[in-house]
Swiss-Prot record:
Residues 1-64 form a transit peptide. This is ATP-dependent Clp protease ATP-binding subunit CLPT4, chloroplastic. One of its GO terms (cellular component) is chloroplast. Belongs to the ClpA/ClpB family. The keyword Transit peptide applies. Accessory protein regulating the assembly of the plastid Clp protease system. Keywords: Chloroplast, Plastid, Transit peptide. It is found in: Plastid, Chloroplast. Residues 30-55, 220-244 are annotated as: Disordered.
Length: 244
């Protein structure tokens, strides 16, 4: 498949003239989440809650967080090497670009960067074959939304609300999938639940349900959401972390 055309993002990335990070709909994954989740159900306004020095959220209320390193534990699950590398990539990208704030799109760029992780393989199976081209499209979209506008130097890098909600939601998906660690496909599920993938690649139908089915096919086990009847099955594969 030819490189994806950047023009298809025109009008999808909602510009924000004064914001350092694009405000293209903030992700909110409610608990419990229904099997019929849609992007419109996941959207909420940015929170004004102060930053904390933890990746976890008190009382399951998601807040912005100081990002010093990828977490060794989030809520009740650990973090796989692949998921940690993806999140750390987003942190390093925010530092290198001098924005000092991680945006959800930067998390997606981490998936696109590590082409051998499970999430990247799933995206390819869903039609996003040119991962390098897609990475450049997301970078272009960040520029359009002023998401790479330099800020004054700060020692701490923070997560924007939407990015932090993606990571926290990913830990929930890991639990619902019966795993003791968050894997890259859980991060992908959280991005899909918030409509991040559909916003950036509207012509590929990367809806939550379609991504969910692809993840379940790859893993050999369905995601058990809180309001659904349990269906047991073996988990046949996890992330390939050979790129580390």
């Amino acid at each position: 498949m030819q490189a994806l055309q950047a023009s298809r993002l025109t009008g999808q990335a909602r510009p924000c003239s004064s914001s350092v990070v694009p405000r293209c709909s903030s992700l909110h994954v409610s608990r419990p989440i229904s099997s019929g989740v849609s992007s419109s159900q996941e959207l909420s306004s940015r929170s004004s809650a102060p930053a904390t020095k933890s990746w976890r959220s008190s009382g399951r209320v998601i807040t912005r967080a100081t990002a010093t390193a990828a977490p060794s534990e989030l809520d009740d699950v650990g973090v796989s090497a692949a998921a940690e590398s993806i999140i750390q990539y987003a942190i390093n990208f925010a530092r290198a670009s001098e924005t000092y704030e991680v945006h959800s799109w930067m998390v997606l760029m981490g998936i696109l960067k590590y082409e051998t992780c499970t999430a990247a393989k799933i995206l390819k199976s869903l039609g996003l074959e040119d991962l390098y081209g897609a990475w450049n499209e997301v970078l272009w979209a960040l520029n359009v939304c002023d998401g790479l506008q330099p800020r004054s130097f700060v020692t701490d890098i923070k997560f924007a609300d939407r990015a932090f909600k993606v990571i926290t939601a990913a830990s929930d998906f890991a639990v619902w999938h019966g795993k003791d660690k968050m894997y890259s496909e859980d991060v992908l599920m959280a991005l899909a639940a918030g409509g991040v993938l559909e916003d950036l690649f509207p012509d590929l139908n990367l809806s939550f349900e379609r991504v969910r089915k692809a993840v379940e096919k790859e893993s050999g086990r369905r995601y058990q959401l809180p309001d659904e009847t349990e269906e047991a099955g073996p988990l046949k594969s996890e992330d390939d972390v050979s790129f580390l």
